[in-house]
Swiss-Prot record:
Domain comment as written in the entry: The PH domain mediates the binding to phosphatidylinositol-3-phosphate (PtdIns(3)P).
Entry's Gene Ontology BP terms: autophagosome maturation; autophagy
Keywords linked to the UniProt accession: Autophagy, Cytoplasmic vesicle, Lipid-binding, Lysosome, Membrane, Phosphoprotein, Repeat
The protein, known as: Tectonin beta-propeller repeat-containing protein 1
Native species: Pongo abelii (Sumatran orangutan)
InterPro entries: Beta-propeller_rpt_TECPR (IPR006624), Peroxin/Ferlin (IPR006614), PH-like_dom_sf (IPR011993), TECPR1-like_DysF (IPR010482), Tectonin_beta-propeller (IPR051513)
Length: 1165
């Protein structure tokens, strides 16, 4: 689960954050302002300060927020002076926007606010449709407006060129005041409340936010154009309301509720992608007539409310079709306010103690939760007082009698490891005097539940110099006095508390003072042991899973307030004695438990072991169907001590019992074949791989399949003597289901003569789920999931269904992934009713997949396999290729055809893509690399002779938004690296690759190719981009760079090789076609070429997604001359960039090679 942050405001206006991975409240970095309330998302936080002004806090990131400004220079040709800026009266402006209707001179483009800065000056964009233009960047046309081309023709009467300039948002990690360009007479009055949400409105562009605010006069305002690239928005819009609003809440989706002065609730209806402000209001009555609604908070599909008597209510029946719900349900507890987070988790602020509470037990099936739990996390400033006391105190207990009193702290340690509740009202904490001179200031301490009445006055007294306020101790114990020597008897006594400040009208808390001192001139509103009084909490940017609750509800073991102040000084000699004593005790225990029993004989000793079971088998003959079989795995030990196994499959044909057997030392892959109905897996042997017809077996349950898969995989590894983590030179691959496979390369795999056939490579599965993987010969492996999350390999093996002996005991972590399932709604036009779902008999299904050949309805479509679960409803996907209209439709003349987003007179059919998200949770040797989502990643391939220990490993990546990034600090000891370095580009990129000599090539979203110059270990980001012309009439989508070779893949599946690359001219000269039918390419450190072929015909079947190896690749023939086919049937990705294993040299390699045979594409159909 990625780290996220909970935001809170105390009564003094200070803003704090609490990370899901931490246990301390951290004071906001920019703490100069005092705030009333805040509303947070994952990337920013909006707030209303005490001056009633709106501020936004954008969290810092390695990727900057950049906006591109464009201006077009237009010229017309005349017979006297040629092209010039003198235009006709009917022409557009000489300097305009892309439409030509708006005047846009370069000096007239200004920054929108002081929070932006220019990156550079204006410059000409010399990229036109993915192709470089001539020097100057001019494009030509017959007239304005028309179709422009980069070539000048005889009838080119006008021309234009695009000037671009980037501005960068600089106010990050500080509170930036929201500017306003509105008329001062129309500016909104001071704001009283605001709420941020709407980032998951169905079909909405990624990064867009909805910011709603309420003014002191009860008016509702909406902030226009707020997005990730424009965090401030542009202007405020006023919305009409049926009454005066006092508070508002916006959820992540299309749910928006507000509170009226009269105690009723307002619900906004009609919120969608095209109208994020909604269309109408509906009124919801409060739970009771006596006490109206004071506060409301909404989430994805829940509504919580607090009435004026502090009661908490839950709204039943909330969904996307009924945002008003059906009825109110009262919850236990009294809160001043509640807030709903990203996944309907709920936080609140207690009515009496002003502490932050979390609603436990909130799940998709039980949205109301079960109970309230207080968050007992301390403040970050308190950590300095307790940084080493816990570890040193526990270390001292190992010395036995050297530290007395360790047994006394044991009960406290046991209690502190469990979840604790705050002391209730009236509970007092015992205290003893520390010094007689301070007895006059001593008072009894009470818990946070003991509050004053409104008649109580605030004592106008300050702590005496040298004293410090502290919060109540949640584990009261016997008070003692600290001793003078660190390694003698330890006694601690806690002094009484000096009365502290409290706000009138709010509960006052008292506690024991601590032993720490403040420097002169420094004061804090809370002492070390005080829990701050909260006024507001926001969980809009906090993601908490019900199965993985943060460590916010436990106190660190053995740490009372007095122990926090304790400082034990351990000398090196004492540390050495402690370690030696522990080692000696462990050695003696080993002798007692093992040495004394080694003379016993083994209870059971046998050389054959058999496991039997019932499975289903996909029979080899027609009609192909699943038949019930009995299977038996027989494992035996050979004469040489090696273990081998045979799998027997017993079946019945025409009442005759038969069987087939498979030697597991011949199995090259065990692949799960998960679908909607069967828990099946496939066994590949070299012969079955060539046939494209594996042995398929299915189990009754998922657990049975996992057991058999783990057992067979372990037996195969034992037969081949493969165990442990993969070697640094391993070849990694990914299937279309996201399964990860790894193969240990043989030295003969890249031999020029008699190379090892690909169908004999042994592939074993690793735990986890990825979309792509990239490896390096120094053991650094990165992966990217379907949800663009980056993962780094931890060095373990196993995970997922591989448990016990088939998995390492460490370096295995939880991993999740999210992907979208797409279906299409098809319609045909008729002259009577227009577009309807009634098509011709020859048409495709009206609800189908992308091909139209398979029927896929919204009700009948299931997740990809039983391991996936739906996490969203169906929504319209507007990001399909070709574009859509405002409703998501694409038009064409007929099925199937080329689709486009605008309707014409010749379009008789249309389709609309629907998507639904599903989630998978598994485990594997992978750790998440937050916080930037990635689209592509490339690690430098290193040849065997390269010196890799003297510098860090170069790693480049492309974010999901198209930003180019360079990872710093990557090494064998720190494979995740330390930080990202942003590399500026003029447009979004999709693919990137770095070669063994630091040559960086990339592909932009429009299919154009770029080369990054001057990349060195001392200059990891290089200096500039060089635009490389793409192959004629082709749009590239992927590039891979080896030691000296550069290969690229276009959108039509054609593989291209870059000719003419030399050290003095690394950009090369031209592209040469190598093959078609390719889906993915990977070039290794030896310039070896491996691809994933789209279709490969075997002797029995056709497989899609096959691993292929380019044969005959040599220095004098870098393109090779043929293909060798390996494992196939559902493979999506391969990475050979870690395989730097050279083949042994033969005597014939010195001879001149004969003429190469004719090259063939990797297709046999």
């Amino acid at each position: 689960m990625p780290n996220s942050v909970l935001w809170a405001v105390d009564l003094f206006g200070r803003v704090y954050t609490l990370s899901t991975a931490g246990q301390y409240w951290e004071l906001c970095k920019d703490s100069q302002l005092e705030f009333k309330r805040v509303s947070a998302t994952t990337q920013c936080c909006w707030g209303i300060a005490c001056d009633n002004q709106v501020y936004v806090y954008v969290c810092a990131s390695d990727v900057p927020i950049r906006r591109r400004e464009e201006a077009y220079e237009n010229q017309r040709w005349n017979p006297v002076g040629g092209f010039c800026e003198k235009l006709l009266l009917s022409d557009r402006w000489a300097w305009s926007d892309v439409s030509g209707l708006q005047h846009r001179p370069l000096d007239g483009v200004a920054l929108p606010s002081p929070h932006w800065e220019w990156e550079s000056d204006w410059y000409v964009d010399e990229n036109f449709g993915g192709e470089p233009t001539e020097k100057g960047g001019w494009t030509y046309a017959i007239d304005f407006p028309a179709t422009y081309t980069k070539e000048k023709k005889w009838n080119s009467c006008v021309r234009r060129r695009k000037w671009i300039r980037y501005r960068r948002y600089k106010s990050r990690d500080i509170w930036a005041k929201i500017p306003s360009k509105d008329d001062p007479k129309e500016l909104p009055d001071p704001f009283n409340d605001l709420s941020v949400g709407g980032w998951e409105i169905a079909e909405e562009p990624v990064g867009r936010l909805s910011v709603w605010a309420v003014s002191l006069q009860g008016k509702v305002w909406y902030r226009e154009d707020v997005s990730h690239s424009n965090p401030e928005g542009s202007s405020w819009s006023l919305l009409d309301t049926p009454g005066e609003v006092v508070q508002i809440s916006c959820g992540p989706h299309d749910l928006l509720w507000a509170t009226l002065w009269e105690g009723q609730a307002l619900v906004r209806e009609g919120i969608n992608r095209s109208n994020p402000k909604g269309s109408s209001w509906s009124i919801v009555e409060p739970p009771g007539s006596d006490n109206g609604i004071m506060h409301v908070s909404v989430g994805v599909s829940v509504v919580w409310a607090v009435t004026k008597d502090w009661k908490v209510w839950f709204r039943r029946g909330i969904n996307s079709h009924n945002p008003c719900g059906t009825s109110w349900i009262e919850m236990v507890g009294e809160m001043t306010m509640v807030n709903v987070g990203m996944n309907d988790q709920v936080w609140g602020i207690g009515c009496e103690d002003r502490a932050v509470y979390f609603r436990q037990g909130v799940t998709p099936s039980e949205l109301s939760g079960k109970t309230w739990k207080a968050i007992v996390a301390a403040r970050e400033c308190d950590r300095s007082h307790s940084g080493s006391s816990s570890s040193l105190l526990s270390a001292g207990c190992f010395f036995g009698d050297e530290v007395r009193g360790s047994g006394e702290s044991a009960p406290s340690d046991t209690d502190a490891s469990s979840e604790v509740e705050r002391p209730g009202p009236g509970q007092t904490l015992p205290a003893e005097p520390l010094d007689d001179s301070k007895n006059a200031m001593e008072n009894s301490a009470s818990g946070p539940g003991a509050g004053r009445t409104t008649e109580d006055t605030v004592e106008d007294a300050c702590p005496a110099e040298g004293s410090r306020e502290a919060r109540p101790n949640t584990h009261p114990g016997p008070a003692t006095t600290p001793a003078e020597l660190p390694w003698t008897n330890i006694d601690l006594k806690e002094p009484k508390k000096v009365p502290s400040h409290s706000a009138a009208g709010f509960p006052e808390t008292t506690s024991l003072s601590s032993l720490g001192l403040f420097p002169l001139g420094l004061e804090e509103p809370y002492g070390v042991d005080d829990h701050p009084l909260r006024a507001w909490v926001s969980g809009g940017g906090c993601m908490v899973e019900a199965c993985a609750v943060p460590r916010w509800f436990t106190v660190q073991a053995g740490l009372s307030s007095s122990v926090h102040m304790l400082s034990l000084s351990i000398t090196p000699a004492q540390t050495a004695a402690w370690r030696k004593q522990i080692f000696q005790q462990l050695t003696e225990r080993t002798k007692r438990e093992l040495e004394n029993f080694r003379h016993y004989e083994q209870a059971v000793e046998q050389s054959v072991w058999v496991k039997t079971g019932a499975l289903q088998w996909w029979c080899d003959w027609k009609p192909h169907k699943w038949v019930d079989v009995r299977v038996a795995l027989e494992q035996f030990t050979g004469h040489d001590g090696a273990r081998d196994s045979i799998l027997f499959i017993y079946y019945v044909v025409h009442e005759e019992k038969k069987y087939i057997h498979i030697f597991l030392n011949e199995v090259v892959a065990l692949v799960p074949v998960l679908n909607e109905t069967k828990h099946s897996f496939a066994l590949y042997t070299p012969e079955r791989t060539r046939q494209r017809w594996p042995v398929r077996l299915a189990a009754a349950t998922e657990q049975d399949m996992n057991d058999w898969l783990a057992l067979l995989s372990l037996s195969c590894c034992e037969s081949r003597k493969v165990q442990g983590r993969p070697s640094p030179q391993a070849i990694w691959s990914i299937t279309c289901k996201g399964d990860i496979f790894v193969s240990e390369p043989s030295p003969d795999l890249e031999a020029h003569e008699h190379p090892l056939p690909c169908d004999q490579m042994f592939w074993r599965q690793m735990g986890g789920h990825l979309r792509m993987v990239e490896a390096n010969s120094r053991g650094v492996v990165w992966g990217i999931g379907y949800d663009h999350t980056a993962w780094v390999y931890t060095g373990g093996y196993g995970g997922g269904c591989f448990q016990g002996l088939a998995s390492s005991t460490s370096n295995i972590y939880m991993q999740s992934d999210v992907k979208c399932v797409h279906i299409y709604e098809n319609q045909r036009w008729n002259p009577v009713t227009g577009y309807t779902s009634r098509g011709l008999p020859t048409d495709r299904y009206m609800w189908s997949d992308a091909s139209g050949l398979q029927e896929c309805t919204k009700a009948g479509t299931k997740p990809p396999s039983l391991q996936w679960a739906w996490v969203s409803d169906w929504f319209v996907d507007f990001s399909v290729p070709g574009g859509t209209d405002q409703e998501g439709w694409q038009y064409a003349s007929d099925f199937p055809a080329s689709y486009h987003g605008s309707k014409t007179m010749k379009d008789f059919v249309r389709r609309r893509c629907r998507a639904r998200k599903c989630k998978l949770v598994t485990s594997g040797p992978w750790l998440e690399v937050p916080p930037i989502a990635l689209r592509d990643v490339s690690i430098i391939p290193e040849s065997p002779g390269a010196e890799g220990s003297g510098h860090s490993i170069a790693l480049w990546a492309v974010s999901d938004k198209g930003d180019v990034l360079c990872r710093l600090g990557v090494s064998e000891l720190n494979p995740a690296g330390s930080s990202w370095l942003h590399v500026g580009t003029d447009q979004p990129f999709t693919s990137i690759s770095i070669g063994a000599c630091y040559q960086v090539w990339a592909v932009a979203r429009d299919g154009s190719t770029f080369y990054r110059g001057s990349v060195y270990p001392s200059q990891p980001a290089g200096d500039c981009w060089y635009h490389i012309p793409s192959p004629p009439r082709q749009r590239l989508k992927q590039v891979s760079v080896g030691q000296t070779s550069v290969y690229a893949l276009d959108e039509n599946g054609n593989l291209w090789y870059r000719q003419g690359i030399t050290p003095s001219y690394p950009q090369g000269s031209s592209w040469e076609h190598v093959s078609n039918n390719v889906c993915r390419v990977s070039v290794g450190p030896l310039d070896q070429v491996w691809v994933i072929a789209d279709k490969v015909q075997g002797s029995h079947s056709l497989s899609r997604g096959t691993v292929c190896h380019r044969t005959g690749v040599q220095p004098h023939e870098p393109k090779g001359h043929g293909w060798d086919y390996g494992i196939g049937g559902g493979w999506d990705h391969i990475s050979v960039r870690a395989n730097a294993t050279r083949a042994p040299r033969s005597s014939s390699q010195e001879q001149e090679p004969s003429a190469p045979p004719e090259a063939h594409d990797p297709v046999c159909c």
